[in-house]
Amino acid sequence: MMTLVPRARTRAGQDHYSHPCPRFSQVLLTEGIMTYCLTKNLSDVNILHRLLKNGNVRNTLLQSKVGLLTYYVKLYPGEVTLLTRPSIQMRLCCITGSVSRPRSQK
């Protein structure tokens, strides 16, 4: 079991280095953290992203995996929901332990 999120879809005619559609980030905010269970034949793809933060350029190495999606689990605070889906091929962006998450304000 791996914790992954689907890579953002790009607009038609753009490659994976182009800016993704804004809808993807909105989905992450409303749908919670998604944990995917993948079948065999995973391929690792490492992509070097250049991020601009506070005027400073920072390079980040992101690991992606390509495989068959069998099902996924939606995780909310205090709730786990298993959702079945037909097996489809997707590229998934791995969430590593180095990813910082914003703290929730009470």
Swiss-Prot record:
* Annotated S-S bridges: none
Return the similarity comment.
Belongs to the VCX/VCY family.
Organism the protein comes from: Homo sapiens
Question: A cellular component term (GO) from this record?
Answer: nucleus
Quaternary state and partners of this protein? Interacts with MAP1S. Interacts with UBE3A (via HECT domain).
Gene Ontology MF terms:
HECT domain binding
- As annotated in Swiss-Prot or TrEMBL, what is the tissue specificity of this protein? Expressed exclusively in testis. Expressed in ejaculated spermatozoa of germ cell. Expressed in the nuclei of spermatogonia, spermatocytes, and round spermatids, except elongated spermatids (at protein level).
Protein name, please? Testis-specific basic protein Y 2
One GO BP on record is:
single fertilization
